[in-house]
Amino acid sequence: MADEFESLFKISATGTDLNGHTGTADLLINATSASLSSEVPIDNTDVISAKTICYDLAYASEPTSFLQWAAENGAAGSIDGRGMLIEQAAVSFNTWTGLQPDTAPVIDWIATI
């Protein structure tokens, strides 16, 4: 993904262990299953700044352990995987029916439950 965006702005990406990483990240994506067992896949709080957005592919009715960790360590914001789930469902619906559903009301509604 970094290769696709490098012509637009400075970007670097890593899929490695961030526990020894120095410097802060603009975006941290948790694509592990750690949140499903209430674990946090990283201990290094030095990667978070007041500009860091944290995204967890997992979703739950309450913030995941990763998103709680992000908030506790000063991240600018956090997003869970519910929006991704809804958008993937919309693509599937469109593939099968040819109709494009309006996902905004669903995203708004699911945020309330």
Task: Put a short name on every predicted segment.
Residues 1-9:
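NAD(P)-binding Rossmann-fold cofactor-contacting core
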